């Protein structure tokens, strides 16, 4: 089983307000926000952005989120380094983290098993 493509992007920022305005200017709409400098923006049926503010001394990062339909059936090829296997998240999915050949981490997410 392969992924279904890019589902979203986890994006760290040093300024939630400016980043949200930047994404809004590109056509994204705020879906929800929190009281601690984070939120989700979406563009019609396209990938979402989960944006979270990080401290000034932390380097902002971005992580792509790939979608699979069934976590139990997904078996990445041996070339894919699994950093952490599928685990339930507090936002209602199952999430695996993998590392690409350049050391970047990617998320692979699936719906919760029924």
Language-model regions, residue ranges each:
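A short linear hydrophobic-aromatic micro-motif
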Residues: 29, 50-51, 83-85
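Short acidic/glycine-enriched loop/turn segments that link adjacent beta-strands
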Residues: 35-38, 58-60, 90-94
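Short, charged/polar surface micro-motifs in flexible loops or helix N-caps
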Residues: 45-48, 56-58, 70-74
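Residue-level structural signal for beta-strand termini and adjacent loop
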Residues: 36, 53-55, 88, 111
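Vicinal oxygen chelate
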Residues: 15-17, 63-105, 110-113
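Eukaryotic phosphotyrosine signaling hubs
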Residues: 6-8, 59-64
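Core segments of cupin and vicinal oxygen chelate
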Residues: 3-4, 10-48
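Short, charged/polar, Gly/Pro-enriched secondary-structure boundary elements
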Residues: 46-50, 103-105
């Amino acid at each position: 089983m392969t992924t279904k493509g890019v589902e979203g992007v986890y994006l760290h920022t040093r300024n939630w307000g400016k980043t949200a305005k930047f994404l809004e200017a590109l056509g994204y709409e705020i879906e929800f926000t929190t009281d601690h400098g984070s939120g989700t923006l979406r563009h019609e049926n396209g990938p979402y952005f989960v944006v979270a503010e990080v401290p000034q001394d932390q380097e902002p990062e971005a992580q792509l989120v790939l979608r699979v339909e069934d976590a139990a059936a997904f078996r990445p090829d041996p070339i894919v380094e699994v950093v952490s296997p599928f685990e339930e998240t507090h936002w209602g999915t199952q999430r695996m983290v993998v590392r690409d050949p350049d050391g970047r981490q990617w998320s692979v997410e699936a719906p919760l098993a029924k």
